[in-house]
């Protein structure tokens, strides 16, 4: 299992993802923000008292942060590659970083 890092870093990452999700509305007014803040404050000092395993809540928060980040990246990739309909061969080649060869003029190519 990879190292979890600090709980504060995980908390800030969750808040960042909430800001991305909400866009225009204030993320501090959402129920998700209030719940996350409450859980981090409740388990701030006595983390092992409420958890069966050491750092269980921190692990769950890190896993949820990974999920939110992955969903956001998936949506960005989906918008970039699947939301444009039919594309020309030049556009498709450009998506993967290639260029089509130039067609020479003259007999046989017209």
UniProtKB/Swiss-Prot annotation:
State the UniProt keywords alphabetically: Mitochondrion
Keyword Lyase listed? The answer is no
Q: Where is this region: Disordered?
A: 88-110
Compositionally biased spans, kind Low complexity? 94-104
User: Do the record's keywords include Mitochondrion?
Assistant: yes
- Judging by the UniProt lineage, the source's domain of life is Eukaryota
* InterPro entries (UniProt xref): FMC1_homologue
UniProt subcellular location: Mitochondrion
What would be one Gene Ontology cellular-component term for the protein?
mitochondrion
Q: One GO BP annotation here?
A: mitochondrial proton-transporting ATP synthase complex assembly
Cystine pairings recorded for this chain? none
Family membership: Belongs to the FMC1 family.
Role this protein plays: Plays a role in the assembly/stability of the mitochondrial membrane ATP synthase (F(1)F(0) ATP synthase or Complex V).
**What protein name applies here?**
Protein FMC1 homolog
Organism annotation:
Xenopus tropicalis (Western clawed frog)
């Amino acid at each position: 299992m990879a190292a979890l890092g600090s709980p504060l870093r995980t908390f800030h990452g969750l808040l960042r993802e909430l800001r991305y999700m909400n866009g225009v509305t204030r993320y501090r007014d959402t129920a998700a923000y209030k719940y996350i803040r409450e859980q981090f404050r409740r388990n701030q000092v006595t983390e092992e008292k409420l958890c069966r395993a050491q750092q269980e809540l921190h692990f769950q928060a890190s896993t949820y942060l990974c999920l939110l980040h992955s969903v956001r990246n998936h949506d960005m990739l989906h918008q970039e590659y699947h939301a444009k309909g039919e594309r020309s061969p030049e556009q498709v080649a450009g998506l993967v970083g290639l260029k089509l060869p130039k067609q020479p003029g003259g007999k046989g190519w017209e």
